[in-house]
Curated annotation (Swiss-Prot):
Subcellular location: Nucleus
Family designation: Belongs to the ARS2 family.
The encoding gene: Ars2
Biased composition (Acidic residues): 328-340
Organism: Drosophila pseudoobscura pseudoobscura (Fruit fly)
Recorded GO MF terms: nucleic acid binding
Protein name per its UniProtKB record: Serrate RNA effector molecule homolog
Amino acid sequence: MADSDDEYDRKRRDKFRGERESYRTERRDERRPIGGAGGGRDEWSERNPFRGGGAGGGGAPRHRPDYSDYRGPGPRARYGSPVRDMPPPKRMRSDWGDGDGRPGPRYGGYDPYLMQAWTDHYQSMHSAYHHASHPPPVRELPIIGGDTLTQPAMLNLKQFLDTQDENISDSEVMRKYTEYKTDFKRQQLNEFFVAHKDEEWFKNKYHPEDSVNRSEEQRGFLRRRTDVFVELLENGTIGSVKVDSSHGDALIRVLDTCVIKLEGGTDEDLKVLDEKPKEALVFDRKPESVDPTTVVENTPKSPKKEKEEDELPLIVSPQRIALKPVNSDDENWDDAEVEDAPPKKPEEEEPKESEPIPEIKQKQKKEKKKKIKKRKRNSSSDEESSSSESESSSSSSEEEEEDDEKLKAKYDVEDGLRAEQKAEAEKDQAEAAKAKLGSVSPKEEISPEKSAADPEVEGEAKEDGKQAEKSPKCDDEKKQENGDAAKVESAAEPATGDAQGEVKPVTIDLDKVNPPRAMHRTSSIFLRNLAPSITKAEIEALCSRFSGYLRTAIADPLVERRWYRRGWITFTRDVNIKEICWSLNNQRLRDCEMGAIVNRDLSRRVRPANGITAHKQVVRSDIKLCARIVMNLDEKFKLWSEGPLSKPSPASDSEATAANGSGSSYGFNSKNPVLQNITDYLIEEASAEEEELLGLSGDRKDGEGEPIERDEQLLSVLDRLVLYLRIVHSVDYYNHCEYPYEDEMPNRCGIIHARGPAPSRVTSNELNEYIKSYEGKLLQFLTKTALLSEDQIKDLGAKNADTEVEKFVQANTQELAKDKWLCPLSGKKFKGPEFIRKHIFNKHEEKVDEVRKEVQYFNNYLRDPKRPQLPEHPGSVKRPETESVRGPGGYRPPMYTPMSGMPYSFGGHMMGGGRGGRHFPPARRELPLEHHRRLVGYHDLDAPSNSDIFD
């Protein structure tokens, strides 16, 4: 008990051991006398004045310790830094992941991104700036982890100057500060790439292999959508609908038709769009508990289904045969009898509805008893066979006679059964003739089928019986019986087919007609929280075990959500989606709570846009913009060309002019049907001469406004372009946005914005402002994505493949001794480095290729002008001086009343002022905060009025 008491007392005070461990040795142990106890946390029991001195409390009681021993005699010593008077700051923990998320070295000692060198360099620079008199602010600490929300704060020019020599020149300072900013940006790109390069979403964007596969997959989706659009355009479906909010039902029908076609549906499946009320009622009844008897009464079944239901119990639960010792012959014979029984059951269960089934079962029981008695005699005769050979010969003759009797009895029973079946068949045929218009029940259909097969079965059974009499051994008899059963089944199959052919007009036609499938209606689950390390394949493997699973969509991560992602899992409409959602909520994937909830159906699929879009001038402008967007997107994905999908490259002058709309024509060089003859609708027309002659001016129209002028021909051209963008490229023109990864979402064509109700009048200023602002909103689709040039990515730290391969070889060439070199990749030793180099290129070629791919991977990330990265730290962003409320060290300057005077040289350092040409103060020359005090103004009331007043 002494040990346990001591252990309990020690653990009782260990709650904050980790937090105090870092400063215990500095603060407490240095001030304690040498002769004092040095155990620190291990001596809490000795420091407790209410406990005994021994471990178990049995020693002499100790005196109450003098706490001055921990500080030493006299006044407390003041150390140089005030940071020792306070505990260290609280250690923050990340929400997910362990450590900084950076993987270990993949290539041995080869560090391609120089992460350790970056960290050491910038930690030393930041620590050089922060002197020992002040701790570094939390916002300026170097942050290494890859899951932070912002980049670490970059030193401004004043802070950077504090780290340099006082005698440095201005030009040298600016040169070094420019280098510091460039290196700082390179470090942030390096850290972000290393933190996310193993994640699936990052590989799909920039990996040399995964990005190509993803692009080809997206191109396949677009080609499929293009084929569907062309089909609908040719059959007139696209031309018969208007992108107007008043035609919402027609728009929804077109979108649903596209979805059914994309899912592989046929024209028969499109009929479900006309049966929406009926389909909704059926769906509402599915989750409810329905009485199975009512369903059986209302829905007729085919003979095939009835036969399958009868045979199910024979296959579902087979008997497990126990292994017995060889000597127990009786039990083994019985097991063999059970083993032989199942193949005969299909023959015996066919006349299941006939009356004499109890008599058949009684005869079978008698046969089984005879077999058991006979085989018991066989086992006893086998045991006594060693005594006399005559007894064994007599037992074998008895066995053959009993087997013959058994076979005769068996076939006599079958003959009686066939006669009964014929009688039942005649009765059934008579009943069927009476009820000509009535529906034939499945039970009445089965018996004529089996009666038609009876003559063949009887003939084959007699022939097999003769062969069984001639066979001398029991094993041969068993084989022939098994063969007979197979022959009976094979002979019964064509007979049943003929019998089914007779009742085809009644039942089979109903069974073969497939109802239209509502392939545009789905059920889905929304995953609110997916860690970046979770892959799409893992979610698919988790959800594919549920029936009705279709696809999975995962969104790109968001920096404000710590790179966590959202996901959508799509199922068919007829599944119990709440049960699946409950099952997913009870599971964790990579220790991540996915947060699964049921995704609701879309509330409003057609949403109105500004009604001014129906005006003729706006429509003509929209046709221009739509045509430019269509050309850019078609060229990006090579939809109407046979060439392979090419990556975006730096735009040339000719491409830039075409992108800006200054090209010679639209549609002349394109095979896209929606761009054919598009230039005929882009030429504006106006009666300028007539207005000039009649003296009509536009000022009067501007004051009163002009009514909305509609041009149906222009609107039909615009509608084709808008629907092409929406169906093929998932671009909602009137919402100036793109719906990403729509082919993997639950609704593949869900929402569309259409022209809303038009106003009565509109002024020309409103038209011009609307056209100009709308073009700015669509700028992301009008401009081509141009990658950075080689010179630009070199400034960002681009890598050379040959240089990195050479570094990889050097890192894996280690000298052990003279003429003794080691290759860490294989552990082999060589006489010189040239042999290791040859060995690496011959035996570890996949490692070298991986280094080259890694270089290309990193350079692809740098080339993207829209690359994902952490936002800049708020302290690094330039702000007006009025917003700056902290000094350079992160401390708030002293506050003053509005009417009080500022202290001397207040603007020199604390507000960024100062004298001289550089405006840089000397390093750390300000007084401590406690020395700053407010100057009290004094005014002598007896002084004359014209004297100077100091306030």
